[in-house]
Amino acid sequence: MNPSGFYVDPLSAIAYDTVYNDLSSSERKEIAEGLKRLALDPCLGDWVLEPARIHSLNSMGHNWWTSCACMGGILALSLQNELPEAKQGAEAVYEALPQWFDFAGDVLQQKPKSFDADGGMYESLNYANFGIQEALQFRLAWMNTHLGQKPVQIPQLDKLSDFFVHVCYPRTGILYNMNFGDSHKNVTAESTLMLLYAMGIRNDNMLWYMNQVEQGQHRDGYFIDRPMGFLYTPDLSKAPQLPEIKKSQLFADFGWATMRTSWEKDATMLAVKSGHTWNHSHADANSFIIFHKGVDIIKDAGNCWYPNPSYRNYFFSKRGTQCRAFQWQRTVA
């Protein structure tokens, strides 16, 4: 299945559930069988189920397994009343999900493990939030269809909120974030935090973070005027003025660090990246950002968005890594 095709599965699940009560038993079965053949089988067949599976947790970037497998899992949950095979598929995704969080990396490809011991996923804030969000959408859907059944524990979930708080920069105006790799400083992670909160994984720092995000500040947010935001935005009236968390953090497993003068808005913050490069965390090692008085006065020199020709022509090369460029020049000389 083409990665862009995985969105067919959750959209089909929503459409099927919407009209489910208006369909006859035969219509439900006919539509379910068609969705299984055209959407579910290609997705779970490629990513999860034997003997058709051609992908692994190591395929593509760290975020793609959940983006594809978990969206297929949502469709499987929608079809499970009519099709025993769909129920089996949903269970297969559910049982495999903790392995994605536990992925230990690949030495041969110099690919680090997905999650740092102190929380967070290194493949840029944008894609960390995306991959985790897709995983949690499925996990929450599974919990909603298995009421009273305790979900399998995933230890990494307990540290995610600290990661997202540490890499944000509160300011007058929209909330900024570290934009190392393929990300933007206006991208935020309220969607992941809302899903965690809905699952019962809660703390006051989450409320503080969500309260800093302005409605509509980025493309994929869970805002109050969108279905997921409408459903899962918690009561933010009890959000604290400041988070209860330390002012510096080292993510040693993937080479990020942050430190700041205060958690008040428009303070001074230093963010440093010096670690692995892979996929969305591309070759901009030894980068740093300084935020001061609400502005990134020193920007990440390695940040470059897809349409820019330099994205492939420069940042995919060794010269795109500052420390390697120095060594390369010296070798040539």
Question: What kind of region is each of these model predictions?
Answer:
Residues Y122-A333:
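Extended polysaccharide-engagement surfaces of secreted carbohydrate-active enzymes
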